[in-house]
Amino acid sequence: MPSFALKVTRSGLSGLGRLSPELAGKAAFRLFCLTPSRRPRGSKAKSAYMEGRQRLISAEQVMLSFPGGRATAYRLNGGAKGPRKRYLVVHGWGSSSEYMSELTVFLANTGAEVISLDLPGHGRSAGRFLNVRLAVSAIAAASARFGALDAAIGHSFGGASLALASAGFLPGIEPLQTERLVLIGAPSAMGWLFKDFGQLMGLGPATQMALEAEAGRVTGRALTAYDERRGILDPGLPVLVVHAEDDKEVSADHARAYAGGGGDVRLFWANGFGHRRIVSAAPVLEAISAFLSETVKTESSPEDGDGTVLSFYRSPVRRSS
């Protein structure tokens, strides 16, 4: 049953839509971009958050500014001397660097310089709103501040934003310079999110069209462009796509779409870890490490020939508690 707040919001948008679908679409887009509370919900989330804070307690915090906002980045091994790799880690919607900290520390323990970015409206970054342009702008600011990357690793919305950033998808923002890309549970398209949101809010056809038009106006690319399978990934960029077929938040079809889009894309199924636990699962960390260190051998997928399937992982994944 819809909550009282949702009923009121639906009613308000419906009334505004009768007066002006354009204004209702703009209001709906603002609601769509409103970020959730930063407070962890439930005992497991609180425990994971506090453990993450402890892992990052000694990390350098750097404030990044960009058109439209500011973001906070955590930097590990920033003062190390000598040549070393540099990685960027980006969390998903409603998450933060704390929840990505196991992966961040795992990478830092290899001796690499690791930057973990809190997207606008998340973690210790300013704001209450997030959209693709803000996310890609924050990523560009991190790249400008710290330099070219050996790899960028992103989860969910963060992964999708990295894919768009590396392809130079948004006008006015320079492409992200990275040698490799790791996408964990990341969507390959955006249109479905707006359709689902429109249904949740009970938007009429005219207001739905205005919502999608506003998304295009703000981000600089029409919403339909986000759903094109070709051109989202740089064909010359090695990409590791990590996904679980039991992911209930982002369908595994998105991983298949990345793999089927051409280029040097490798697909790793981490079944049993869902959408959130996947970022700290031991087999996933091992797969990422192997991919980043260039020790992975690949073979053609026996299923459909799209992309490649990593050969070092065949057995079913044991669920973690």
Placement of each model-derived feature along the sequence:
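Conserved alpha/beta-hydrolase
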Residues: S97, T104-A126
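Catalytic histidine-centered segment of alpha/beta-hydrolase-like enzymes
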Residues: F273-L285, S301-Y313
